[in-house]
């Protein structure tokens, strides 16, 4: 195996598939499996899911640039591991300060089934949503590639839409007390956007949420 050639290739790409590793290493089948296991064992490769990896070298280079660049890289990986998807829910709410606790998972919305991937660089958690609610995300850039993350309003919509409440009283108690949500973070545009998302959803539960948010003068 030409490890120098491999490292040169790995430092150019944000992730690599097992198939492309086989082409670089000129290995296949059990021989390829052997080398993949070896590269994982010596920390050259970090597995994201079956057949998909990143290089420790690339991850360390990005992390050294800045925390902001590392965060965008993780969002890019979250978008790539399970497609289509966009980062949302607790991760965005925590990042914005609306949730007081840090999110230790990169949480995303997907059109595919709910799934969780635990890796050495973090946990990537995906929740399914109906196709008609798959919108409300912003397009940003990472190394010339698009990354998708929800606006604060859409992350809030996703968060409440996918959460189970037994009654209006439980919704009210959560948004005013137990949820510990810092509603002061929302600006006028966030509030309008959230109200618009809820109104157009035609979800009875979300209409109840909007009624309570307005009654409590939150939006």
Named regions from a protein language model:
Residues 47-52, 57, 70-120, 126-130:
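Short gly/ser-rich loop at a beta-strand->alpha-helix junction or flexible surface loop bordering the NTP-binding
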Residues 18, 89, 152-153:
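Structural motif detector for alpha-helix initiation sites
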Residues 117, 122-149:
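A contiguous pocket-lining binding segment that forms or flanks enzyme active sites
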Residues 1-81:
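Short beta-edge/loop segments at beta->alpha junctions of small alpha/beta modules
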């Amino acid at each position: 195996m030409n490890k120098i050639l491999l490292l040169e290739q790995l430092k150019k790409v944000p992730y690599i598939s097992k198939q492309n590793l086989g082409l670089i290493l000129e290995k296949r089948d059990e021989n390829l499996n052997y080398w993949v296991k070896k590269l994982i064992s010596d920390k050259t490769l970090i597995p994201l899911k079956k057949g998909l990896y990143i290089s420790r070298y690339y991850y360390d280079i990005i992390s050294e640039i800045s925390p902001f660049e590392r965060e965008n890289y993780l969002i890019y990986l979250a978008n790539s591991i399970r497609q289509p998807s966009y980062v949302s829910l607790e991760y965005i709410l925590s990042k914005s300060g609306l949730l007081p606790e840090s999110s230790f998972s990169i949480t995303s919305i997907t059109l595919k089934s709910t799934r969780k991937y635990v890796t050495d660089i973090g946990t990537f958690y995906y929740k399914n949503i109906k196709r008609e609610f798959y919108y409300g995300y912003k397009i940003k850039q990472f190394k010339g590639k698009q990354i998708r993350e929800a606006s604060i309003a859409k992350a809030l919509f996703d968060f409440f839409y996918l959460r189970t409440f037994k009654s209006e009283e439980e919704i009210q108690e959560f948004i005013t007390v137990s949820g510990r949500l810092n509603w002061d973070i929302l600006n006028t545009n966030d509030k309008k956007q959230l109200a618009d998302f809820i109104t157009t959803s035609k979800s009875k539960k979300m209409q109840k949420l909007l009624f309570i948010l307005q009654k409590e003068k939150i939006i």
